[in-house]
């Protein structure tokens, strides 16, 4: 196989990798040959996933971690450094929480929790991973953002704020750390069929409205996001950095179009 299309010999850390988009990302990267460390807040889901990946022959290990905790993030990165001998090729900041409600109904605790989980964790883990990514001489950071960080969506102003910040962080790190052989990109999905998005899909009118605004006429699947993440980590994508790429079925480019009934 052309080495540009392989992750053989590379290492990765995926946060929130035991379910949803994170789970799909782990499978994608492992399938391309990467050794992966996964963290997740759910011990049950993590153990189930690790068992599943072992049966598939994937090189995946992991531990429980609440990435909203500063000390747990530090412990996580110490573990990863020991696991991979001080080198890391790929960091996927995937963890995120959503708490949609009108802006005037949010309280300080809502803001603090969302910021620490969605934004501060990604920022801090990127800081902690820098020496490992630099040591690998081929580092890549992927931020899992959202179309809610690109256009206005009914997913809550705090959520949108954190995702927009991740998009800007990818641009900044792409420029600041390029000299260290580190690329940074942001992947912004539309609503994807995952457990986290399930409450939205339970509202039939909401789903119908979303689909009507999406040119491809449907929500996405986790593996439609993970495929892009994997590509951005490959040597084949070595000249792509600082980008926010929407995986959204065309939602963010859709203007007004009128299609009369036949």
UniProtKB/Swiss-Prot annotation:
A Pfam short name: adh_short_C2
MF term (GO), any: oxidoreductase activity
Enzyme Commission number(s): 1.1.1.-
Sites where the protein binds NADP(+): 13-37
Classification of source organism: Eukaryota, Viridiplantae, Streptophyta, Embryophyta, Tracheophyta
Protein residues bound to substrate: 146
Record's keyword annotation contains Nucleotide-binding: no
Active site: 159
Catalytic EC class: oxidoreductase
Swiss-Prot/TrEMBL keywords: NADP, Oxidoreductase
Keyword Oxidoreductase: yes
Protein name in UniProt: Tropinone reductase homolog At2g30670
UniProt cross-references to InterPro entries, sorted A to Z: NAD(P)-bd_dom_sf, SDR_fam, TR
Stated family: Belongs to the short-chain dehydrogenases/reductases (SDR) family. SDR65C subfamily.
Annotated source species: Arabidopsis thaliana
